[in-house]
């Protein structure tokens, strides 16, 4: 029993590539012959060995991951830092291929109606004037801050003036109504203002030396804590908004009024569907005007409405203000326009109902005022031109490759003197010489045949005579004849026949 046990035990030093299945295979036979206690001891020892093997394999895998990914566990120079192990688990991330996008990119109006600009702005991109988009860090992108906040932070916001006015009104009202602030000193008012600020505003106030810069100026301000607070607010407003409301308040009011006059005079509305938007913009600049000139711009509000609706509203507004039915204010003008629009919408809904249930023939009715030379406004029918697509042909694989030749020109050019070629019989000297190309003699009688430049032609003629060839000038024999095929038109052939007759 003991000998068998020694043979079964594995060595204390283990190889890295040892498999646990082999260990169980070797010991399964021996365990059958052991007692229960011996089996327990043997299994316990095997489990320890397996744990050592797994720990060693885990450390090896971590070392390989570190070498491959070059993970820095700790950025500190000291050795006390706690090592952060990388996550080696691979999670199954579901694929999004074939799924519908969360944002409908393929809409007809997506690229042209400004939807793409909004989509790009949400992701930190801003459209440039020259075209294209530029990426802006998130911390430098202006945000819209809640105006009900009790903390003043003017860093990178797009509604700084409105936020400043809301913050000033809230704390100013609290200083006036709360009796707790009646006995506040100048230093306590300064600290109170500084406490409810953040960012650049708080840094600006903290950099001020209270004893030399703040205290002397606050001492000159007459009034209670609210007057002191208002002085500090005017300093902040001039620093961050850029307007000196302390010494040049009237000049600022005049500038705002001039800006409002220009804006109201150039506003235009052509569609009453945008009446609410028109009202919001008009009201904003209307109350920047001085109280004396506002009555003129109430009528301008109605005159800018599309004709003849604007003229009708002007008459109704004057009539109702004279009867004291509505107030002679901008609110009264807005009210009469909205009531008229509501009544018109109700009448149109009735017309649709009646038109669908009962047919009314109004054409040709003499009681209806006629319109001479006028045409009814009809909606233009939308037509779409069919796009011509280039037709594609599949190659005919079964056809053999052909050689293409240049096409011959079969069009015949008309000759100046159509007919048979001129034949020069023997005895007549009207044909041209083959050597000098002059009329009056034959080639064998050419006086220029002895010249150097004509020797080649003369030699050719002599060789032809030696071979038995005769020129066309000589008469044809009875045995051999030479024929020439000439293609002629039907008209020319008929004329020649008449001449021969």
From Swiss-Prot:
GO cellular component, one term: host cell
Molecular function terms, GO-annotated: nucleic acid binding; structural molecule activity; zinc ion binding
Source species, domain of life: Viruses
Stretches of the chain forming a coiled coil according to its record: none
Main location: virion
Function: Self assembles to form an icosahedral capsid, about 50 nm in diameter, nm, composed of 420 subunits of the viral capsid protein. The capsid encapsulates the genomic dsDNA. Following virus entry into host cell, provides nuclear import of the viral genome. Virus particles do not enter the nucleus, but dock at the nuclear membrane through the interaction with host importins.
Protein name: Capsid protein
